[in-house]
């Protein structure tokens, strides 16, 4: 696998602890405590999911930092206690607790924070603007980048895209799954989650589909917009940007293979 430490494109999976990966992605007999170190050598990013369900310890974040390569980047899911609420404007205390939990122990390896919303959450312009206003631009001296993963059709509006763009927050670009796609780039980086791996493909996706995803990632990184993503508004001219691409859900056992194949194609 070719690993380019200078690439602005980071590719990975969700989490690193998954029983079916043992003996498939992870070598048989690899100690569980060595799994992150192994995954970090094969991938260029991982989306931490455990933070969505509950607080992690500062020493855990510090250990994860130390167990991965220098150029590795973690995306981190924001806590559900902030996003799964009727009135988003009241999420302030949950957001503050999250950033006090030790997440900054990831140091320079802290990538975007993904705030994932329930599939039933509808777009309320005023309340969503109040939520975005609560998101800090920095914590403990680290610049913080935010992404929002909205999963209801009501968000497919120019008003939502403009709102996200005004706050410099990336809209997660979902693909190959059940959720609506909003392909508009609204921040200085792109965050995409692709969900189409299948059991019948050794690499999760057909070779042609992997090549297409590699080209989309390269287009985003150069400041462009792939011609086949679904936009709500008008594309804006942009400079080169970071790209975070995660292979999620689908037939999860194949996700590491798909991610590694993408890294190889991106170069």
Regions found by a protein language model. Name each.
Residues 1-267:
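Residues lining hydrophobic/aromatic ligand-binding pockets adjacent to catalytic sites
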